[in-house]
């Protein structure tokens, strides 16, 4: 076959695939997905061990899902590696032509960006198919849907930080008038990402200066899953927690003396979204479940087990808090653009500098 014939054949195949995708995109309805989902029954899901409240929360989600759609769905859950590793795994599976290991993928902007760039996500007209899903919820249009909103912020123990000395922003942490209260006692996260994203508000030089001052007064490093050490009083304050408001609500419900405050305005925010990877074993059930997680009954389960919710679902804890406190969140598009630009030499150098500062 000549090169021209090969080209024409390839173009014809690509055209046929695009037509097929367009028809599939247009053909989905709630009714057709429910009918197809009833034949699939099992939703395979790999994520962090405590995702959606662990087994108890997932059981509640199964019950609410089946009640809404008249299905007999079961979540076949397995704990897996971190979100970056799971994204890389799905991309490799898709490129090899295999079925992916999880029907759905949960990740924030950075993790979903990895999948988006590799064209690893199913195209689904969520807002067009499901009446309760809005276009605003599609963080990556026709690919991902917001499941819960996680504003970043400072957390501290109110029994150990006097009210008149309490920080109201990240800059207060290194203010010479306030910092003696926690100098040599403050915990900071070991991650570069929260500082790198802070540059969207501050610029790189201001972030590096802040990081140096913060490290100079720090007492140690805490991961985002270790906020209990603030509750216990081992550290009186933590410079940043990736899900600060949800953590505060969770611990306050247990009687813990924890307060969360935003570090910047607008607040640096992680938008955790669900998507359906290409080659999913149970694609109809997966699409239905992604949309279901934005319903009030699904959000109630998240709030019950994790104190998490979407600010875009009316009546949720996050929705009410942000509206009543008049707090503004960083635009998803702003942080998405940051990740979709990829790792420039300048960006990699900046992160390398931050990593070096954190190790001091």
Regions found by a protein language model. Give the residues of each.
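Mature extracytoplasmic/periplasmic domains
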Residues: 267-268, 272-337
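Extracytoplasmic/periplasmic substrate-binding proteins
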Residues: 202-207, 217-279, 314-326
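Extracytoplasmic "Venus flytrap"
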Residues: 25-30, 40-60, 272
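Conserved C-terminal helix/tail region of periplasmic/extracytoplasmic solute-binding proteins
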Residues: 331-360
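Extracytoplasmic ligand-binding site segments that recognize negatively charged/polar headgroups
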Residues: 46-63, 76-91, 98-235
